[in-house]
């Protein structure tokens, strides 16, 4: 009886492990479909807002660099 209980728990834990790759696979499949759907307004909006935010971040963080200043050690 104890051996059958151990078998069930081992099988249960063995069955739980593949669920994570399935969920990750479903998530990756959804991301791929979302990224490759050319007629999706939400994708275009999110992508454009993300690119805009990245551009604003770069402009704000790289504007402090003075490219004409003499470089140390040169």
UniProtKB/Swiss-Prot annotation:
It comes from the Eukaryota. One of its GO terms (cellular component) is mitochondrion. Residues 1-14 have a biased composition (Low complexity). Residues 1-24 are annotated as: Disordered. Transmembrane segments: none annotated. InterPro entries: TOMM6. One of its GO terms (biological process) is protein transport. Pfam families: TOM6p. Keywords: Acetylation, Membrane, Mitochondrion, Mitochondrion outer membrane, Protein transport, Transport. The keyword DNA repair does not apply. The modification N-acetylalanine is found at residue 2. It is found in: Mitochondrion outer membrane. The keyword Transport applies. Belongs to the Tom6 family. Forms part of the preprotein translocase complex of the outer mitochondrial membrane (TOM complex) which consists of at least 7 different proteins (TOMM5, TOMM6, TOMM7, TOMM20, TOMM22, TOMM40 and TOMM70). This is Mitochondrial import receptor subunit TOM6 homolog. It comes from Bos taurus (Bovine).
